[in-house]
Amino acid sequence: GFLNIGPTIEYVERAFDAAKYGWYSEEPFIDAAIQSVVDPDMAPPGKHVMSCFVQYAPYELRESDWDTERERFGDTAQAVLESHFPGFGDLVLHREVVTPVDIERRTGLTEGNIFAGEFLAPQMYFFRPAPGWSQYRTPIDGYYQCGSGTHPGGCVIGSPGKLASERVLRDLRSGGHSGR
């Protein structure tokens, strides 16, 4: 099961504003997945696993650092969930709070950006990952790209690979492509 906590556009805008000014929101937008609803083997019987993508969190905090704020950030997200689902906090047996700095440390993704490139209008759709590099082709003949840095982005799991493979098949059927 999936759920989002972002009841209005104004709510989402306020959540983003905090990050824009170097802090995290006291009422963040939360995109949550309860994976064990789909795959019960992920948790013991009667229990569940839930992942929350809490937006928006700046890489650099204006008045502190993520090592200091990590648990408070987690408390903030948990309080928002509790406000929408009373009793939620009593059900949490364990949590791990992962900040943008943690993502960068663990994976090498610059500033913890999981989208493999800014997810802004100039780098979306046929501009993803950059103008002239869309359609999964590269300037190197026979070399293609896919992943969260390509259309439609990392939020649509599996789609970049499917779409890239379809591009490869179309090019093979038509005689390939000769780079750009």
Task: Give the positions of each predicted feature.
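Flexible loop/turn segments at secondary-structure boundaries
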Residues: 38-41, 58-61, 100-102, 151-154
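Hydrophobic, well-ordered secondary-structure elements that form the walls
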Residues: 52, 77, 81, 143, ...
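Conserved FAD/dinucleotide-binding core of flavoprotein oxidoreductases
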Residues: 44-76, 80
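A conserved FAD-binding loop/helix module that cradles the flavin
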Residues: 148-169
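Active-site-proximal substrate-binding core of FAD-dependent oxidoreductases
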Residues: 93, 98-100, 169-180
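Mid-domain catalytic core of redox enzymes
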Residues: 1-43
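A glycine-rich dinucleotide-binding beta-alpha-beta segment and adjacent secondary-structure elements
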Residues: 23-33, 87-151
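Short glycine/proline-enriched loop/turn "hinge" motifs that connect secondary-structure elements
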Residues: 40-47, 134-138
